[in-house]
């Protein structure tokens, strides 16, 4: 077929029509531009005008009394990284790629990273569940996420270790996402074993923006952003109001308010920025439900077994950034502080423990955080070869108050264990299960060396050293304690090439994630079950990877990688945030897989992309069920799309997302279903100031599962407990319509 060679408007109309009916496509991968300063620094941040990454917005220019903001240069997937990237699985997603994707939930922006899957098993205000590289990452355990250098992950969180809530992000203000996968980057510390995503926000806008949208199931959203010159700098401010009920029989009634203000000054060589953010959200929670409850007609497909589940959360932050760069060196400093709280009500087992009052519980948290990131890079030569030496420091302190309580209809209440199979059958379960005051302090030092040894050989060597202090004050003095731990993490990469616009990568490294501080010091469980001894607060991982990146075919960016990761989880004490119970049942596991990504732009109006990955995850030895498969570990994932931009103002994007079946228990006796979704976006630019949008989600109205679990529950009082699949359904076919005003 010669269609891709046509330049006529007729060909564009044909391909625009094709997006209405096609589910697949060709190629995908995200890539940023080469560094402008000619140094060895590989993938720059998502924009050449991002103060958070050491590149500030240039100062405004005044002409004839009118202040004009500078042009903003955004990098993206089509950029060629051959010769600059340190890995085949490193890249940048630009604002244009994010805008061209139909996104139902903010967290789905991260699905622009090849291999990442985002799901949800509860109400919209709860953090998403992340999957990558053979991991069910829960709410962020091994995926480090930051916004303008401020960490999003929360250690020792009331609900889950490394909890990362993307609801604080306003998508239109995201300038780009830079990502790295694997334990090979000295600057990435806690929670980065599977990967890291760095989200960069605009510091100025070329024009003001107002966006209004409405849709099915009670969806509505209003957003505005404005950028203006103040003195020799720029002030950007914006906000968002959001509401969504969802298709659930008991509406989510998710309400979200976001606000941001950023003042920036300077240029790429010298500048700073100050940013304040605020987020508040409240919601009802449509938690996962038992398959038998749906099959028997007890509840409908979009029903709930405990309609009083839900929660609320707030996060308020301030941060400042300063940078400078010259021909000899560069320095970046980023300081931040934020307040966070969460009040979450959940019920996953319904009446298994107490068939009178039910099994709902509350997880409550208040947290204050302060931290600093600083790095200094020296540009020089080694035996006449170009060299960079980077020295970095990252410090953080979390003051945390966590609580776990028994509740009914969101009211704290004493309960009675009515399950004859429980060792505490007939005993009173107090309303307060566990309360802790925690101070967690971390400091990370790192060094990275880059040398261009010859025309075809580069190396990147790094060493990171982390120090953590876990200080826990529990209501039970036996579970209180103060523990200091440290861990070195060497890393290395060799890059060969390029030959014919193709280069090869060989990587290896060590990394880690921190344990929940309560697990580090806990010696007795709320149910008096044994723990089995103390364990490490820092859980090491090690990995290796071989990869290739090529732009040999014109307009096609392609990468391929084979990777391996081993997690030493037998040194980790597992802490169940839902029960307050700690065990030493963790055991080491290994994961390995393959990833292919392609991004093809044959013309300036057509983009085709496709990512594919497969991974395998096994315990080193059989677990208690007798199997070696890691439950819920991600297997196959496919993301593919076709995007057309017509000069007449029309654009369209059709995307396919496939999330393959996963073993739900180690023996493979129970598997999840696969999920295949087709989403479609159409945009029409009426003029320079007005644009209309339409997003269609789950175009084929498939009744798939967003996520699956396998465990025991009891769906009603007096019913027999069942061990079965529990699932949260994907949302059905729905449409959202919007209008954007720029002025």
List each model region and its residues.
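N-terminal periplasmic "start-of-domain" segments of outer-membrane beta-barrel proteins
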Residues: 40, 46-56, 70-104, 126-129
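Extracytoplasmic beta-strand/coil segments of soluble accessory domains associated
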Residues: 90, 107-154
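C-terminal beta-signal and adjacent terminal beta-strands/loops
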Residues: 98, 608, 661-662, 684-743
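Short acidic/polar hinge/loop motifs at secondary-structure boundaries
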Residues: 150-181, 200
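Transmembrane beta-barrel wall of Gram-negative outer-membrane proteins
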Residues: 214-243, 248-286, 308-328
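Face-selective signature of the C-terminal outer-membrane beta-barrel domain
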Residues: 271-277, 311-474, 554-562, 601, ...
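Membrane-embedded beta-barrel scaffold of Gram-negative outer-membrane proteins
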Residues: 321-323, 330-346, 497-513, 519, ...
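Gram-negative outer-membrane beta-barrel transporters
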Residues: 375-379, 455, 459, 468, ...
């Amino acid at each position: 077929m010669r269609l891709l060679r046509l330049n006529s408007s007729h060909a564009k109309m044909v391909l625009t029509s094709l997006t209405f009916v096609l589910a697949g496509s060709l190629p995908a991968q995200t890539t940023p531009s080469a560094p402008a300063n000619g140094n060895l620094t590989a993938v720059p941040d998502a924009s050449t005008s991002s103060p958070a990454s050491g590149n500030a917005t240039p100062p405004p220019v005044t002409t004839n009394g009118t202040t004009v903001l500078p042009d903003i240069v955004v990098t993206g997937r089509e950029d060629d990284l051959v010769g600059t990237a340190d890995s085949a699985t490193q890249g940048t997603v630009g604002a244009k790629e994010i805008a061209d994707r139909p996104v139902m939930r903010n967290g789905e922006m991260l699905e622009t990273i090849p291999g990442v899957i985002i799901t949800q098993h509860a109400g919209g205000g709860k953090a998403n569940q992340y999957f990558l590289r053979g991991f069910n990452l829960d709410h962020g355990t091994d995926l480090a996420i930051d916004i303008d250098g401020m960490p999003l992950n929360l250690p020792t969180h009331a609900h889950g270790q490394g909890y990362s809530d993307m609801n604080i992000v306003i998508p239109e203000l995201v300038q780009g996402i830079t990502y790295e996968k694997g334990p090979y980057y000295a600057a990435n510390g806690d929670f980065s074993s599977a990967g890291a995503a760095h989200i960069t926000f605009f510091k100025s806008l070329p024009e003001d923006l107002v966006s209004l949208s409405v849709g099915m199931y009670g969806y509505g959203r209003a957003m505005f952003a404005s950028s203006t010159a103040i003195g020799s700098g720029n002030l950007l401010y914006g906000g968002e109001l959001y509401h969504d009920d969802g298709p659930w029989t008991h509406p989510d009634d998710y309400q979200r308010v976001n606000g941001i203000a950023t003042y920036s000054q300077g240029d790429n060589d010298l500048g700073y920025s100050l940013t304040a953010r605020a987020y508040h959200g409240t919601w009802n929670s449509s938690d996962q439900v038992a398959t038998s409850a749906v099959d028997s007609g007890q509840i409908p497909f979009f029903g709930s077994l405990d309609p009083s589940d839900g929660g609320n959360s707030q996060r308020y932050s301030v941060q400042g950034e300063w940078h400078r760069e010259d021909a000899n060196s560069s320095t970046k400093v980023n300081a931040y502080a934020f307040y966070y709280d969460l009040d979450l009500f959940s019920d996953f087992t319904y009446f298994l423990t107490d068939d009178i009052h039910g099994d709902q519980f509350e997880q409550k948290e208040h947290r204050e955080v302060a931290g600093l990131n600083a790095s200094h890079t020296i540009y020089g030569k080694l035996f006449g070869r170009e060299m960079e030496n980077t020295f970095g420091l990252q410090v953080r302190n979390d003051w945390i108050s966590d609580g776990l309580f028994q509740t009914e209809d969101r009211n704290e209440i004493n309960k009675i264990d009515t399950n004859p199979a429980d060792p505490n059958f007939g005993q009173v379960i107090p309303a307060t299960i566990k309360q802790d005051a925690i101070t967690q302090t971390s400091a990370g030092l790192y060094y990275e060396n880059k040398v261009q040894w010859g025309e075809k050989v580069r190396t990147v060597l790094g060493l990171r050293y982390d120090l953590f202090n876990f200080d826990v004050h529990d209501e039970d003095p036996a579970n209180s304690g103060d523990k200091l731990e440290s861990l070195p993490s060497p890393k290395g990469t060799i890059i060969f090439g390029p030959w014919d616009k193709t280069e090869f990568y060989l990587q290896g490294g060590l990394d880690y994630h921190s344990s929940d501080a309560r697990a580090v010091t806990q010696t007795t469980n709320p149910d008096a079950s044994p723990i089995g001894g103390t364990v490490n607060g820092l859980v090491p991982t090690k990995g290796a990877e071989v990869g290739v990146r090529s732009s040999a075919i014109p307009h096609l960016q392609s990468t391929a990688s084979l990777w391996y990761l081993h997690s030493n989880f037998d040194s980790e004490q597992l802490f169940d945030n839902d029960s307050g119970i700690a065990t030493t049942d963790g055991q080491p596991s290994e994961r390995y897989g393959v990833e292919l990504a392609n991004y093809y732009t044959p013309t300036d109006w057509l983009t085709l992309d496709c990512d594919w990955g497969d991974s395998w995850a096994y315990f080193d030895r059989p677990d208690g069920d007798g199997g070696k498969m890691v439950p819920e570990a991600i297997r196959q994932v496919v993301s593919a799309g076709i995007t057309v931009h017509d000069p007449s103002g029309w654009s369209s994007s059709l995307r396919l997302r496939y999330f393959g079946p996963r073993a739900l228990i180690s023996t493979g006796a129970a598997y999840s279903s696969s999920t295949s979704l087709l989403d479609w976006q159409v945009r029409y630019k009426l003029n320079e100031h007005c644009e209309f949008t339409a997003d269609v989600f789950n175009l084929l109205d498939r009744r798939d599962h967003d996520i699956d679990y396998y465990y025991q529950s009891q769906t009603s009082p007096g019913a027999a407990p069942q061990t079965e699949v529990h699932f949260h359904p994907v949302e059905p076919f729905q449409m959202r319509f919007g209008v954007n005003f720029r002025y």
